Amino acid sequence: PNIGSGSKLSFYLKEKHGIEVKIVTINEDEKIVKRFDEKSKIFYLSEMLTYTSRNFHLASQVAYIEANDVINKVIKDNNVESEEVAPLLKLSLLNYYAAAFMMPYNDFLKSAKLHKYDVEILMHHYACSFEQVTHRLTNLQRPGNEGVPFHFLKTDIAGNVSKRFSLSG
């Protein structure tokens, strides 16, 4: 239903940026997850990726093309000079852009409220994974236009925390 999914994203990359998307079979290259060849303007994605992972990688490529300069400026303007921190911050901001591109704030919040924050409906509507949707729900903290203050915690089967996120405190 929105530009942030599958074939629409591939079409967007082709029409707006001249980038062709090619799905790589395991027989062609079993090690590839994603790769962008700037010279040929081909973005390669593994056939082994789930549909939602492919979507996110496509949106991440859009983020890299459309927001890279702005993100670099944000990092520079905030004097982030650490060789360890700057790349992590850049990746986080690119991923945030990708999620926002797939699930635009106002549209996503309206849909979340309409469907009473039903994660499965939102997953279907935005062609995103459980983790992508729940992570985006934690981001809905725009002053004056907030969503429910969600907290995100990802653990492995043994209970080890591998990811935590909250913007609400």
Task: Show the residue positions of the predicted features.
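Conserved binding/catalytic microenvironments
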Residues: N2-G169
